[in-house]
């Protein structure tokens, strides 16, 4: 609808026009003849309308008390002439122009001497300039959200009188304006300054004259002020403040901050208070910084990446329940005095010291952790920490210990003697990349509820002794990469391992170079689906018995025994390969094997056999007469460098689907191969001249030299 005719309207006695044209879908609205003499309420009058052209020149507004939300969400209205508005009786202008598209409007005609509520008046607007020098704000009590996310280039509040204002929360949040002068602001009665300058674009915010003796909430006050270089808070009276959470969060260019006069005896929440103050290199906490009532210190110093030292010896923490990520990513922090911390009420220590890459010593022997429920990631990336004594830790309520010591690659001594793991369900990456640990005794661990042990000891590169023989693994589902890259580990006692629920063992022993003995005869799981690379690069293994291994659901057996150089005995008698699709590199470089019994192998679904037996240089005979290869597409280098292989029966081979068969018998100098010429015609030209070929056709052999 283009326009709307109101000429027939008789409104001479109407007092309430709130919502009258709210959400109306018209472009033009001429109200020059609308009688508004008796109207006292114009709130939401044009709220959310589609109006582009609006005529209110003849409005009589002398009696109007409420203009709140009047033009809010008028997204198509660019200009409106309110020069005849008389607002001398208006009390409420809450969100009057909020989220509108108005760009030019003459506000000098507005009389605001009785207005008490200016909440959100210009929030989310794009006025080219806001000249408010005529505004009388002496009666206003609420200015919260007033200029929130206002994109005006010029805002003049130099004549503001704010002595009665109690709420300034979000007042300048997200403001993008030039050279704002706050010197006129009187904050004597303000109780709420939360989010006041959040995400502000200014490099300097002069608040040195602020009176804050009545302020109760400073949460998010300067959060995200990433351009601010200097903040003078030395005169702040914070004696009544209860919430300082996120107060300086994200002030990434703030190098100095004076909080020496902060009185914090009533503060309950300090969550993320200094988070991401990445340029801050010093913080001085005096005795006036009283934390006796604080319950939340989560991420309080997180990502204060320039802090080198922290003295928190005055901190009282007996009521704190959350210390998660408290020092997370304090990358330069070398010393932190938390010797007097009382952690008896703490429930969450997740990532508490995570990524403290320069922390060399940590005195937490007095920590009480009987109520802590989460410690995952607690010490991860503490790359310089050499010793850690957690023998006093009570971990009875912990269910997640994942990545607890991840990347503590300088850690040489770790005391976990009294760890209670009765309720732990997740131990993924728990000791991963503890590259300097040589001995680890976990005999006290109760793992009856653990479901995930993947990557648990990954990259424990110097570990020579690991006591886990008492582990109960009956509930474990994932053991993938559990011992991968334990280069120095020569023995593992796993005979009591119960893997009935395990589905994934990918890479479990990969790169355990020195592992000599491994009794996995008890391993039996009928739901196992992943074992590729399982023993890859176990150079020192001499024997393996997998006769009880249920592999009926396995589809990928690639690289399982690759580079098991010392393997002399391998029992695969009952292996089920009926679902396997790839066997590439399966026995590659098993150069101590002299024979292989693969009579149980069913290869009907296999597509990849490249490098399967390559470099098995001691292998003398191999019976593959039952192998089915009609679906195989790649047999490149399958037997390459099997120098001692004398006889190879591949008479069952059908290579009609094969697309790649380069160097199939490369360097098999002593080999006699038995094959069906008709089924293997594609590979004939790839057989080198030094290989003796015997053809079989209806059980009749012929020899070609």
What is the role of each PLM region?
Residues 1-705:
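Negatively charged
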């Amino acid at each position: 609808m283009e326009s709307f005719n109101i000429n027939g309207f008789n409104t001479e006695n109407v007092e309430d026009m709130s919502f009258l044209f709210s959400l109306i879908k018209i472009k033009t609205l001429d109200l020059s003849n609308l009688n508004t003499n008796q109207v006292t309420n114009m709130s939401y009058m044009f709220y959310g309308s589609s109006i582009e052209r609006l005529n209110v020149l003849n409005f009589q507004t002398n009696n109007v008390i409420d203009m709140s939300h009047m033009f809010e969400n008028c997204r198509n209205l660019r200009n409106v002439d309110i020069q005849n508005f008389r607002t001398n009786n208006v009390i409420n202008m809450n969100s009057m122009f909020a989220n509108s598209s108005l760009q030019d409007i003459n506000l000098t005609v507005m009389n605001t001497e009785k207005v008490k509520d200016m909440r959100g008046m210009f929030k989310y607007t794009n006025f080219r300039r806001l000249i408010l020098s005529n505004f009388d704000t002496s009666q206003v009590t609420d200015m919260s959200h007033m200029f929130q996310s206002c994109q005006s280039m010029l805002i003049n509040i130099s004549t503001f009188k704010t002595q009665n204002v109690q709420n300034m929360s979000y007042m300048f949040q997200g403001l993008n304006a030039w050279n704002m002068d706050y010197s006129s602001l009187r904050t004597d009665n303000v109780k709420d300054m939360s989010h006041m300058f959040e995400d502000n674009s200014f490099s300097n915010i002069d608040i040195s004259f602020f009176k804050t003796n009545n302020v109760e909430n400073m949460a998010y006050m300067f959060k995200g002020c990433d351009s601010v270089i200097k903040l003078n808070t030395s005169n702040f009276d914070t004696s009544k403040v209860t919430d300082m959470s996120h107060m300086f969060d994200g002030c990434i260019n703030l190098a100095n901050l004076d909080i020496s006069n902060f009185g914090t005896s009533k503060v309950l929440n300090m969550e993320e208070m200094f988070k991401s103050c990445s340029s801050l290199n010093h913080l001085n906490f005096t005795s006036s910084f009283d934390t006796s009532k604080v319950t939340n210190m989560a991420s309080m110093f997180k990502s204060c990446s320039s802090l080198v030292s922290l003295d928190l010896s005055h901190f009282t923490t007996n009521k704190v329940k959350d210390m998660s990520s408290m020092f997370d990513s304090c990358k330069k922090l070398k010393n932190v005095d938390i010797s007097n911390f009382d952690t008896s009420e703490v429930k969450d220590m997740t990532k508490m010291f995570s990524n403290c890459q320069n922390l060399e010593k940590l005195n937490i022997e007095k920590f009480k952790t009987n109520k802590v429920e989460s410690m995952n990631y607690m010490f991860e990336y503490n790359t310089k920490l050499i010793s850690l004594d957690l023998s006093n830790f009570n971990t009875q309520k912990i269910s997640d210990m994942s990545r607890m010591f991840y990347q503590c690659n300088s850690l040489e001594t770790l005391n976990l003697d009294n760890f209670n793991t009765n309720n732990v369900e997740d131990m993924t990456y728990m000791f991963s990349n503890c590259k300097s640990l040589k001995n680890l005794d976990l005999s006290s661990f109760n793992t009856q509820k653990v479901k995930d042990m993947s990557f648990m000891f990954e990259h424990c590169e110097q570990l020579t002794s690991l006591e886990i023989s008492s582990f109960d693994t009956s509930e474990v589902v994932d053991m993938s990469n559990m011992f991968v890259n334990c280069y120095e580990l020569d023995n593992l006692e796993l005979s009591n391992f119960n893997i009935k629920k395990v589905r994934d063992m990918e890479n479990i022993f990969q790169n355990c170079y020195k592992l000599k003995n491994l009794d996995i005869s008890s391993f039996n799981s009928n739901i196992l689906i992943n074992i590729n690379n399982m023993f890859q690069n176990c150079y020192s293994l001499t024997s393996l018995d997998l006769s009880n291994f249920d592999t009926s659901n396995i589809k990928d057996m690639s690289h399982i025994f690759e580079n098991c150089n010392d393997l002399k005995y391998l029992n695969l008698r009952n292996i089920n390969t009926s679902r396997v699709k790839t066997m590439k590199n399966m026995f590659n470089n098993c150069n101590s094997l002299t024979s292989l019994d693969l009579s149980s192998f069913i290869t009907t679904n296999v597509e990849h056999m490249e490098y399967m037996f390559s470099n098995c240089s001691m292998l003398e005979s191999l019976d593959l007469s039952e192998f089915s290869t009609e679906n195989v597409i790649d047999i490149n280098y399958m037997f390459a460098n099997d120098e001692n292989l004398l006889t190879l029966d591949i008479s069952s081979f059908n290579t009609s689907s094969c697309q790649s068969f380069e160097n199939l018998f490369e360097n098999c100098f002593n080999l006699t191969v038995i094959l069906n010429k008709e089924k293997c015609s594609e590979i004939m030209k790839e057989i080198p001249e030094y290989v003796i070929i015997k053809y079989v056709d209806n059980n009749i052999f012929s020899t070609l030299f």
